[in-house]
């Protein structure tokens, strides 16, 4: 759903074969496969079930992708959860679940794909953080901490893997119209749009098109960067 689904479709439109993971809704995943196939009839699209907070499931998904496609040119990590809660009300479970999906899952996926990318001396790793990973968000401390961790991972991994022909970049979306905003009222959204210099909210497709650009060979001299797709709300 959201940025993930939009990204699969944009990569399909750009001519890529795509394997992606789903966790809770197989019907939605299969619908994305059908849409991708319609955009790129000659492409191959595979939906794999995985909870990204489980390293064994992530490893299995990567191995299945390699078996079906032979090699992996790019990895994009955008699975995420969000939760609004006072810091003093956070439970251990809240904290560990947030880190498990939003940060541990990124680590597991990068670790799983890197051996193959290193062998082939080429790879694009694309991570999704958030503007809250850059600025911090009140009542979203655990989410902000996880997304800040993604930014730190991006910068450090880019330095380590650059000599192997692998770039690592991160997109930090601003306020994007996705399911995560379901609890926001129309008034809330209008206020957020007013705070944004371009005076509107972003779309998943705008984030997805940025990721497709970073995956391309034309972005080979860009690495370790955090690109804000945020309408100017963070400058």
Where are these regions (language model features)?
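Residue(s) in the substrate-gating loop at a strand-loop-helix junction
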Residues: 130
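Catalytic Tyr-X3-Lys loop
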Residues: 73, 81, 88-108, 122, ...
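Alpha-helical segment proximal to the catalytic Tyr-Lys
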Residues: 115, 159-160, 220
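Conserved glycine-rich Rossmann-like NAD(P)H-binding loop of the short-chain dehydrogenase/reductase
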Residues: 16-31
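Substrate-binding pocket helix/loop in short-chain dehydrogenase/reductase
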Residues: 86-87, 94-96, 181, 188, ...
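Canonical Rossmann dinucleotide-binding motif of NAD(H)/NADP(H)-dependent dehydrogenases/reductases
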Residues: 1-19
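Short, small/polar-rich loop/turn modules that mediate ligand/substrate recognition or access, typified
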Residues: 70, 162, 167, 222-224
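Active-site helix of classical SDR
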Residues: 110, 146, 154
